[in-house]
């Protein structure tokens, strides 16, 4: 019996890992992988990690990875080739060697596309200058490492402030490079809501990173050698020895499109529950493959931080033994990074996304301890923001910014969301708790109980972003209910101070016809003040969600 031929197109590591699993499932499979360079490709998070770890010999590491795939699974890796055509009727892939220019073809029984993402090269003057990189390969990493070691890279500009941009900025900062992060949108980290992203921005600025938002790069200026030396925005001229451009990544789908493969609404390759395209025998995996969002049911394109094990299992089993395995659930777009001594994690929908989907959204923000609080060591605050459908309590999303607890909290909520859970399920979830994280309620239970109180109408909250807007446009009373000594140490502009214990005696100092926003350190005393003032007949009340500790605006 002839061996089944599997061909993988693309250097994204998901492809060769799926091939290895398929060979493990069916040893009769003969697998070949066609890649454009000398090595497989990692995503930009891992490439950024290599930048900050100067002692890591990335080429030796990747060489050993590729040798393991060859030795353990018999996979043939054909390097330095460019695929020029997919011929579904003939079941052939045509390619040419990039070094010798010769043209060849390979036949397949199953074809797997793992082409990953490619940058959209902007129409910006100077984009082709030296030392302007899109951080797409190990060669980029090595060039950056060598430039830093030689003292040639002292100032860098990172363009694009998503999670990959923030992580890349940290990698350069850890190497002693002066970093400027430039984002054309109104905030860094569009994966997070504004007030959560601002917490990260404040930390980055505190660490010495310059952060510019709402600024589009207009041009890059080079020297006589053709290397970049300046980045021009509408407001700044930024000196730069290196520019890393991370804006506007898109799935690499042109070869698939030419072969008659349907490209989905997200811009990625459309696949079914078997990860198979509309062309029988051709599958897609990784960042170039479209997924379905678990909450909205709509197609999405994911820039994954790691290999999706569930997808690899499905596609490898189907390649090995026919379409017998299906992908049961959609994705929640869960992401997390650790950067600048902060953990950042999110899952589900952001507030803006949820509203765009037509949900009536309720939010709750709490501050919880993180790290080693109870042991007398250092600790950090962890901001937790939960979003639910006001009509039924269905969980729509959660975001965390703080210490090492962030991804644990998000992972736990993501598990409940994948089961269709509600905030009531969170409130009664039996999870491992420890007094180093919470003296009373587990953080998940805490944010769930705050949310339930809101849904029951026990109090009304206001987000930091909403309060910042009100302070610019409306005359509301900002009532700080902390002690006088705490108030003197710092509060919000225009706030007045009536300590919680003095509310009854001093209630006549408050105008009942104006909106009163109650603030305290974490929001707990403000909540008690809300209850007491309601009992005194005040109606136009709200509590600052998360308290002053989580208010990120100046």
Segments and roles (model prediction):
Residues 113-175, 264-265, 270-273, 496-500, ...:
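Glycine-rich dinucleotide-binding loop and its adjacent helix/turn
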Residues 30-32, 72-74, 78-99, 106, ...:
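A Rossmann-like FAD-binding core segment of flavoenzymes
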Residues 128-152, 238-317, 412, 416:
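FAD-site-proximal beta/loop scaffold in flavoenzymes
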Residues 424-476, 484-554:
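Rhodanese-like catalytic fold shared by cysteine-dependent sulfurtransferases
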Residues 2-76, 169-192, 326, 334, ...:
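Beta1-alpha1 glycine-rich phosphate/pyrophosphate-binding loop at the start
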């Amino acid at each position: 019996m002839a061996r089944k031929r599997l061909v993988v197109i693309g250097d994204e590591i998901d492809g060769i890992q799926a091939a290895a699993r398929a060979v493990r499932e069916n040893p009769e499979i003969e697998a070949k992988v066609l890649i454009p360079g000398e090595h497989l490709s990692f995503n930009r998070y891992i490439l950024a990690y290599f930048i900050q770890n100067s002692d890591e010999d990335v080429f030796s590491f990747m060489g050993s990875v590729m040798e393991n795939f060859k030795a353990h699974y018999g996979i043939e890796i054909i390097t330095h080739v460019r695929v020029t055509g997919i011929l579904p009727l003939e079941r052939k892939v045509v390619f040419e060697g990039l070094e010798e220019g010769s043209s060849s073809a390979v036949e397949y029984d199953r074809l797997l596309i793992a082409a990953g993402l490619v940058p959209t090269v902007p129409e910006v003057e100077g984009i082709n200058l030296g030392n302007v990189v899109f951080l797409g390969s190990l060669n980029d990493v090595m060039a950056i490492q060598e430039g830093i070691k030689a003292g040639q890279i002292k100032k860098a500009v990172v363009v694009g402030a998503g999670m990959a941009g923030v992580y890349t900025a940290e990698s350069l900062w850890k190497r002693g490079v002066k970093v400027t992060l430039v984002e054309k949108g109104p905030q860094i980290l569009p994966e997070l809501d504004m007030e959560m992203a601002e917490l990260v921005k404040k930390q980055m600025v505190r660490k010495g990173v310059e952060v510019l938002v709402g600024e589009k790069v207009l041009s890059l200026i080079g020297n006589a050698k053709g290397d970049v030396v300046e980045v021009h925005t509408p407001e700044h001229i930024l000196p730069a020895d290196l520019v890393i451009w991370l804006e506007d990544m898109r799935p690499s789908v042109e070869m698939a499109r030419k072969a008659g493969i349907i490209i989905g609404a997200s811009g990625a390759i459309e696949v079914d529950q078997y990860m198979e395209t509309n062309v029988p025998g051709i599958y897609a995996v990784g960042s170039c493959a479209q997924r379905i969002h678990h909450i909205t049911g709509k197609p999405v394109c994911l820039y994954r931080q790691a290999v999706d094990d569930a997808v690899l299992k499905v596609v490898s089993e189907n390649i090995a033994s026919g379409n017998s395995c299906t992908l049961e659930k959609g994705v929640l777009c869960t992401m997390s990074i650790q950067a600048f001594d902060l953990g950042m994690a999110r899952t589900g929908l952001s507030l803006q996304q949820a509203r765009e989907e037509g949900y009536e959204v309720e939010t709750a923000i709490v501050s919880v301890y993180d790290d080693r609080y109870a042991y007398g060591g250092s600790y950090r605050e962890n901001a937790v923001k939960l979003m639910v459908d006001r009509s039924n309590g269905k969980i729509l999303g959660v975001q965390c910014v703080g210490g090492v607890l962030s991804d644990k909290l998000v992972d736990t909520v993501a598990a409940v969301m994948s089961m269709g859970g509600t905030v009531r399920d969170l409130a009664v979830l039996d999870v491992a708790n420890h007094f180093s994280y919470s003296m009373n309620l587990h953080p998940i239970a805490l944010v769930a109980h705050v949310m339930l109180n809101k849904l029951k109408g026990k109090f009304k909250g206001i987000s930091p972003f909403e309060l910042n807007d009100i302070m610019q446009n409306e005359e509301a009373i900002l009532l700080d209910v902390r002690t006088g000594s705490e108030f003197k140490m710092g509060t919000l502009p225009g706030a007045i101070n009536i300590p919680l214990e003095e509310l009854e005696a001093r209630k006549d100092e408050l105008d009942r016809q104006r909106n009163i926003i109650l603030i305290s350190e974490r929001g707990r005393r403000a909540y008690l003040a809300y209850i007491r003032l309601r009992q005194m007949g005040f109606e136009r009340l709200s509590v600052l969600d998360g308290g002053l500790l989580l208010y990120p605006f100046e």
